[in-house]
Structures are given as C-alpha cells and as structure tokens.
Amino acid sequence: MARLGRFQMATASGLVGCLFLYTPAGAEPAYVGIVREYVEKLVRPTVEMPLVVKAIEEQNSKFGDVSEMDMRVLDETYRAEVARGDLQMVKALMAKSVSQYLKSKQDDSQGTILEFFVTDCHGLNVGQSGITTDYWQGDEDKFLKTFSLASQDIYIGRAERDESTQLLETQASFVVTDEKGIPIGTATVTIAIDAL
C-alpha cells in the first residue's frame, strides 16, 4: 500500500485543519494567503464605495471629540441591550443604508462572509450586517493592528472553529481611506475558511 505524504493526506481527507499542523515556525498558516486574496479582490472594493466612505465620514464628524469613557458607555449600553434582547442600538444601526449594503454583500457571498462591519476612526461601529458582540472595536487587535498603526496591510486573526456552527472562521480587517487616501475607519469581515 502506498504511503501518502502529509500534504496529500490532508488533501485526501479534506481536512483544512491538518495543514495548520505542518506550518513551519515563523511561516503564516495556509489559510492566511487565501483569506488575504479573497479580501483584497472581493471585500476591499465593496468598502471603497461612496456609500460606505460617506457613512464613515459622517460618523467621524458626529463623534469627532468623543472621549474613551463615552465610547465605553456606548459599548456597555450596546452589550447590555444585546444581552437583554432590547436591540434599540442594533435596530438603529441596522436601519442605516450602509448596514443594508453590507448585509447584501454578506448575502451575495454565499456563506463565505459570516459578518461584515465598518467602524469610524475611533473604532465605533458605523454599519454592520448583523448583531455584533460589541459596538466599540477600538480596544481590539482588528483596530489596533490596522487603524492605530495606519497600516495598509490586511490583519488576519487566528482561525478558530465556531462551536455552534462548526465552521472554521477567521476575521480580516483593514483600514478604510477617503478619496485622498487618508485613513477614516476600518472594515472587518468574518470569513468561513471552509467556504473558500
């Protein structure tokens, strides 16, 4: 009986997870390049649309001098509403045309995009495709490793299997710029790696 190599075994068994076991130290996992290409080709162009840029710019004007304490209060209020099922902030966000646009792009992805949201320059959600766990992203890597560093790179988080769906997922985030190339916010998508 012929022996299969590690890569052939992973391919033959259809287990993307096996590829993670054989990633050399210091090398990025196999899914990172695939996710980066998907985001660069299909997600970034949808975020560069005037509807999204304008919505972010409007919120930046509205919350121009918001304090960190105020952002934390907004975030705690949002989280409490989600926990109680009293979704006033969520409903207001979901009623925005930018949220409806992001939801349509998620739906068009045929299960590849599981979540899609954009933030302002503080990390506060501007638009979202569904209920997020929190309203302020400014204290998380998805914001700190993109907007806070003025990076043009796509930050891709660690892949994890969602316990409820059993899908292998990762989040990818990048800076959104205005027409002059000035950073104004961020975009984040949760990607079902199994769907790529």
What residue ranges belong to the model's regions?
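Bacterial N-terminal signal peptides
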Residues: 10-22
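Juxtamembrane extracytoplasmic/periplasmic/luminal helical "stalk" adjacent to the first N-terminal
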Residues: 26-89, 111-112, 195
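Short hydrophobic alpha-helical segments used for membrane anchoring or interfacial signaling
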Residues: 115-121
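Amphipathic coiled-coil signal-relay and dimerization helices
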Residues: 124-129
